[in-house]
């Protein structure tokens, strides 16, 4: 439940975070940087699915009929390309997740993204650990892996060079990030 998906949408391919659920639980702590960062992540996910996916992608079953259930989606159409992809091919390093890698480096350079220092005193850890959806035994390993992936992406990217994306439309995503950041 780290993304606050509710049971109603859990079986769907598109699972938007339930922002009200998050705010009910942590709204009183939004001034804390880690809670605010968590909320920003969920809000960006929500907007990405709600505002971007709905305009650019359609999902189909094996009979090429519209489909929303995760287990039944077989094909993905990228509307501006008028191209249909096999689901496995679409969600691959060549296409969708490859674009993520290229965008991560671009956005990290553009917005000077850095990982925070994770050395906290006991009182800070107490506040941070109030986020019960995080597996705190696994968190350090996940952070190190994510930090390494981002560092690797940034290292191979040329600063100032706009990445050649296969699936995503970068100017729209930049606008989405900026609009979302203003709402946090």
Which sequence ranges carry the predicted segments?
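N-terminal leader/auxiliary helical segments
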Residues: 1-184
């Amino acid at each position: 439940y780290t993304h606050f998906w509710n049971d109603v949408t859990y079986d769907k391919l598109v699972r938007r975070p339930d922002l009200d659920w998050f705010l009910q639980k942590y709204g009183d702590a939004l001034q804390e940087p880690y809670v605010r960062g968590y909320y920003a992540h969920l809000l960006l996910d929500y907007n990405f699915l709600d505002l971007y996916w709905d305009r650019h992608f359609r999902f189909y079953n094996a009979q090429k009929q519209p489909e929303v259930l995760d287990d039944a989606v077989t094909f993905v159409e990228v509307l501006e390309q008028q191209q249909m992809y096999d689901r496995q091919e679409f969600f691959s390093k060549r296409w969708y997740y490859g674009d993520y890698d290229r965008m991560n480096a671009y956005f990290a350079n553009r917005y000077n993204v850095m990982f925070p220092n994770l050395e906290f005193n006991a009182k800070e850890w107490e506040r941070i650990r109030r986020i019960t959806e995080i597996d705190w035994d696994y968190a350090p390993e996940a952070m190190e892996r994510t930090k390494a992936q981002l560092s690797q992406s940034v290292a191979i990217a040329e600063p100032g060079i706009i990445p050649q994306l296969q699936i995503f439309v970068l100017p729209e995503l930049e606008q989405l990030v900026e609009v979302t950041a203003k709402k946090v």
